[in-house]
């Protein structure tokens, strides 16, 4: 579920560095929202990141 159905943005991985430079794994999760949108002419529930919502890549169902 943590993937945008429009652009495919998913979880990013990296490291967190403490003040003493101890490295621990961490992840950056995209801001995914459930949205009722028009897909192929019918309303459908999809998961979309907020960047796609703001840029108007999704036609929302009313």
Swiss-Prot record:
An annotated GO cellular component: ribosome
GO biological processes: translation
Sequence intervals crossing the membrane: none
Cell membrane among keywords: no
Matching InterPro entries: Bacterial_rp_bL28, Ribosomal_bL28, Ribosomal_bL28/bL31-like_sf, Ribosomal_bL28_bact-type, Ribosomal_bL28_sf
UniProt keyword terms in alphabetical order: Ribonucleoprotein, Ribosomal protein
Pfam families, A to Z: Ribosomal_L28
Molecular function GO labels: structural constituent of ribosome
Family: Belongs to the bacterial ribosomal protein bL28 family.
Name of the featured protein: Large ribosomal subunit protein bL28
Organism: Syntrophomonas wolfei subsp. wolfei (strain DSM 2245B / Goettingen)
């Amino acid at each position: 579920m943590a993937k945008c159905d429009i652009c495919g943005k998913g979880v990013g991985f990296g490291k967190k560095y403490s003040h003493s430079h101890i490295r621990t794994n961490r992840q950056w999760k995209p801001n995914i929202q459930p949205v009722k949108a028009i897909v192929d002419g019918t309303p459908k529930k999809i998961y979309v990141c907020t960047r796609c919502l703001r840029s108007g890549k999704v036609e929302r169902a009313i």
